[in-house]
Design a protein with these regions (language model features):
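N-terminal accessory targeting/assembly segments
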Residues: 1-119
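C-terminal-of-GTPase-core extension/linker across diverse P-loop GTPases
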Residues: 1-16, 37, 148-226, 232, ...
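Switch I (effector-binding) loop of TRAFAC-class P-loop GTPase G-domains
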Residues: 2, 210-213, 234-264, 273-283, ...
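Switch II of P-loop NTPase G domains
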Residues: 2-5, 30-34, 57-74, 251, ...
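Conserved catalytic network of the ASCE P-loop NTPase/AAA+ motor domain
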Residues: 8-9, 77-84, 256-260, 265, ...
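Conserved Switch II/interswitch segment of TRAFAC-class P-loop GTPases
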Residues: 23, 55, 59, 94-97, ...
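Switch/connector loops and helix/strand junctions flanking conserved nucleotide-binding motifs
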Residues: 24-27, 58-62, 97-102, 119-122, ...
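Short alpha-helix plus adjacent loop in nuclease-associated cores
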Residues: 117-138
């Protein structure tokens, strides 16, 4: 069976669709759509239009209401008349098979949701056999309950009893149902094979981790695109792929780092994101085991991002879901060089908002909140890097003495360039 991981980024135009609900206000919806646009651009698409609608919850049939769907349809039609074809419509939440089928029937263009878009980017980014296997398994998990949509063209073959003796559902009797069941079996068999491969990879990686010697393991964690790989490069003096795109890192990279005369292992991990598909987290178990087995987590945060506090919450929740919560953790607020704020006029008596807070005020707030267990840096501009190394050195040394009290682990004094 041909492997499912094939994804070439081609420039296509896209429309984004999101909802404003009781639990997601207009500001948050805008931030989610900004992120969705960044995802679309990472996948190779150009966003030409956004549509939002206020609803108590997503419409179970078409996600948005009938009127909004008609509005989107009219926009696509107008673009076609102006010889500007819309390649796809991307929805900010995961769609059911029924929703995708109904929306496609109305809009007549490719329909994606946030999950399928993330999976596509992961497929594009996967380089090693391990990453490709993990992505392929996640893709099949996503595709399996949506198989029926892939066979809607068989509904036109008629409703005769066929070989199935009339036992299938309306529109899926006969050869359609047979093919659907065959495909389901093929995919289930393929998934079983992929799981066996990943189990073997898990075993190999577990052995590798045990053979790394008596050194403290430190893992860089954080939201996607916060600068983990750039920081990894600075600390390890190696060249880990770093790019201003989402999910630039899929495979974990482990490097031996020496600060002064203290060696330890540093791991760069895949970035987290809001609404990260559960199947993706499950499929990347072997990769995320590096987080579970770390002695110290360095949580990297992009402080210049307007919604960095929610990103912190997303990462904390994901770490808790991985059963890696409770580990010694320090927060590194990165990108201080990119932080901006709007100064209020002297006669403006309205309360300060997030955009009016200076970096100094923010630093004081978070240092008090975290009991000074944080530092503010710029990996790109190398601001406060010496201070960061000193903090890491002290934390790793303390952990090493606790974990390996009788191990003479210090190297001969190591002079950094």
């Amino acid at each position: 069976m041909k492997e499912f991981v094939i994804s070439e980024a081609q420039v296509e135009t896209a429309i984004l669709v999101g909802l404003i609900t009781q639990t997601q206000d207009e500001r948050k919806t805008k931030e989610y759509l900004d992120e969705l646009e960044f995802l679309a651009e990472t996948a190779g698409a150009t966003v030409v239009k956004r549509f939002t609608q206020k609803l108590p919850a997503a419409n179970s049939v078409t996600y948005v209401g009938k009127g909004k769907l008609e509005e989107i349809k009219e926009y696509i039609h107008q673009e076609e008349e102006n010889e500007r074809e819309v390649g796809m419509v991307i929805f900010d939440d995961e769609l059911s098979a029924k929703q995708i089928r109904n929306i496609e029937a109305e809009l007549k263009v490719k329909i994606l949701d946030r999950t399928s878009l993330i999976l596509d980017i992961f497929a594009m980014r996967a380089q090693t056999a391990n990453a490709k296997t993990q992505v392929e398994l996640a893709q099949y998990k996503y595709m399996l309950p949506r198989l029926q949509r892939l066979w809607t063209h068989l509904e036109r073959q008629g409703g005769g009893s066929g070989a199935g003796g009339g036992k299938g559902s309306v529109g899926f009797r006969g050869p359609g149902e047979t093919q659907l069941e065959m495909d389901r079996r093929i995919i289930l068999n393929r998934m079983s094979l992929l799981k066996e491969r990943l189990a073997e990879i898990d075993k190999q990686k577990s052995t590798q981790r045990k053979n790394r010697g008596r050194m403290i393991r430190v893992a860089l964690v954080g939201y996607t695109n916060v600068g983990k790989s750039t920081l990894m490069n600075l600390l390890s003096k190696s060249e880990v792929f770093a790019e201003n795109k989402l999910f630039a890192t899929l495979d974990t990279t482990v490097r031996k780092v020496i600060i002064e005369n203290l060696p330890f292992l540093l791991t760069d991990t895949v970035g987290f994101i809001r609404k990260l598909p559960t199947d993706l987290v499950d499929s990347f178990k072997s990769t995320l085991d590096e987080v579970r087995e770390a002695d110290l987590l360095i949580h990297v945060v992009d402080i210049s991002h307007p919604d960095f506090e929610e990103q912190i919450s997303v990462v904390d929740k994901t770490i808790a879901d991985l059963e890696a919560g409770g580990k010694p953790t320090m927060i590194v607020f990165n990108k201080v060089d990119a932080y901006t704020y709007v100064e209020k006029a002297e006669d403006d008596l309205t309360p300060k908002t997030r955009e009016n807070i200076t970096l100094e005020e923010l630093m004081k707030t978070w240092m008090a909140k975290l009991n000074d267990n944080c530092i503010f840096i710029s990996a790109r501009e190398k601001i406060n890097m010496d201070e960061l190394k000193t903090i890491i050195y002290n934390k790793v040394r303390e952990l090493h003495v606790q974990k390996y009290p009788y191990n003479d682990f210090l190297y001969q004094t190591y002079d950094e360039e």
